[in-house]
Amino acid sequence: MPSTCLVTVETQDPQVIPCTLSSPSFVLMAVISESLSISQSNPQSSIISLIESAVTSLSYVTWHSLVTKLISHFVTPFKARNCVLIVLVQALHVIPCTASITSLISF
């Protein structure tokens, strides 16, 4: 059974709802891995735009259902996008960025 990563988001931003997300850690690692890959060709990009690009990229490939589940934890699409980005930014600090997407598929 895959390990899970529990991340709680609390913010004063009125556009982001406080939430707790528990999802397979390999989903977050895949997004982070993709973010790092994108940053190779776009070194000037901000971390938010990198993660956003990664989520978009992954959601149109084999990770679609996993990313969809990640986002479905939140109440409204408008707030979900912001909250997911914050969760992923926080995840950067707690999950090792060593795995590649290829190796994660075997989980």
Curated annotation (Swiss-Prot):
It is a multi-pass membrane protein. It comes from the Eukaryota. One of its GO terms (cellular component) is membrane. It is found in: Membrane. The keyword Membrane applies. The chain crosses the membrane at residues 16-36, 47-67, 85-105. Keywords: Membrane, Transmembrane, Transmembrane helix. The keyword Ribonucleoprotein does not apply. Overlaps CCC2. This is Putative uncharacterized protein YDR269C. It comes from Saccharomyces cerevisiae (strain ATCC 204508 / S288c) (Baker's yeast).
